[in-house]
């Protein structure tokens, strides 16, 4: 029996990154030997065991054979004669097909070290094309390591295109698509994930609402980058700098979906694209089974992002109504989330990346003023039933009006 550290732990250690999870491959053993040594078996489809002390995963070396469609259509074979090289060959990328023995020596049968040095994401073998999930995984790795200068090898991107055109991605379940997307949204450069999907044709298959934005022009005066698809990825990049929250990043990604519905004869203007985009947000989220909280914020951002940008022109009643519409009284975090997504929208434009965004500050300040109006004082004043709500709203409007007069500049 020989045990090797494999995969991401080896890769990230070589890149000088922190290692979170460690996976091990066991060569020359059997399930019974593992059980006799005190390991606990957890894998149903193939033998995976938990170490009795560390609870890290130890998998018997195995090979895989395509036996059906999609990413689940594989038959696994494991036996003591399966070699380490056999096991590593089934992995997706060469940089993930590295192993380390107990002496610290790196085993590299597929030139993963060379590709690490050259910052290349390259598939190990043609078997890559048998698993459509790998298209998303490579896009996610490209996003995860973009800051280190990684790029996808030309032959791997070509294979990803062939897989997409062959309809392989249609076998992916919504849950797996969302899981990979959610992971990509946590990376430093989530926009790279969607750009890679577009480069291989997968964006049109998995995110048609986003793909439809490319080639749709916006007024050059407000959007020097012109293309709405490019603007969308720029805003996502900016959102990633402003917030680590997946819901903020996803909502930013979806903020302009309504522009994809504008008839070409009306370009480059997109009047009413915010409310129009709400249905597309709902459509996308329902298809991918996006969690409700993330979906709800994306809907609100699509509907109200343009309104927040015009904050100095809003009257106090509209401002308080906005807080009502986003349910800020029960979910105050939404004010900050909308401020961040709106800022990402404004700064996600060519030449505006470092622009100040006072509207975000005013939105936050206006909220602090409105929510500081005490409900208790209204009740003690003798108001009852529905009158309490009406009087509280009136006092909030008055407070916001007073604040706005002093702090928020009047529009020209």
UniProtKB/Swiss-Prot annotation:
What EC identifiers does the entry list?
A: 2.7.7.72, 3.1.3.-, 3.1.4.-
Please state every residue range assigned to the domain named HD: 228-329
Name the coenzymes or cofactors required: Mg(2+); Ni(2+)
* Record's keyword annotation contains Transferase: yes
Q: Name one GO molecular function term.
A: magnesium ion binding
Q: Which reaction does it catalyse?
A: a tRNA precursor + 2 CTP + ATP = a tRNA with a 3' CCA end + 3 diphosphate; a tRNA with a 3' CCA end + 2 CTP + ATP = a tRNA with a 3' CCACCA end + 3 diphosphate
InterPro entries named among the record's database cross-references: CCA_bact, HD/PDEase_dom, HD_domain, NT_sf, PolA_pol_head_dom, PolyA_RNA-bd, tRNA_CCA-adding_enzyme
The UniProt keyword set, sorted, is: ATP-binding, Hydrolase, Magnesium, Metal-binding, Multifunctional enzyme, Nickel, Nucleotide-binding, Nucleotidyltransferase, RNA repair, RNA-binding, Transferase, tRNA processing
* Record-linked PROSITE patterns: HD (PS51831)
GO biological process entries: RNA repair; tRNA 3'-terminal CCA addition
Q: Where along the chain is Mg(2+) bound? A: 21, 23
Sites where the protein binds ATP: 8, 11, 91, 137, 140
Give the cofactor binding note: Magnesium is required for nucleotidyltransferase activity. Nickel for phosphatase activity.
A Pfam family it matches: PolyA_pol
**Ligand binding (CTP):** 8, 11, 91, 137, 140
Let me see what the UniProt entry remarks about domains: Comprises two domains: an N-terminal domain containing the nucleotidyltransferase activity and a C-terminal HD domain associated with both phosphodiesterase and phosphatase activities.
Other observations noted: A single active site specifically recognizes both ATP and CTP and is responsible for their addition.
Q: How is the quaternary structure described?
A: Monomer. Can also form homodimers and oligomers.
In the record, the note on similarity to other proteins reads: Belongs to the tRNA nucleotidyltransferase/poly(A) polymerase family. Bacterial CCA-adding enzyme type 1 subfamily.
What HAMAP family does the entry give?
A: CCA_bact_type1, CCA_bact_type2
**Stated name of the protein:** Multifunctional CCA protein
Q: What is the lineage of its organism?
A: Bacteria, Pseudomonadati, Pseudomonadota, Gammaproteobacteria, Enterobacterales
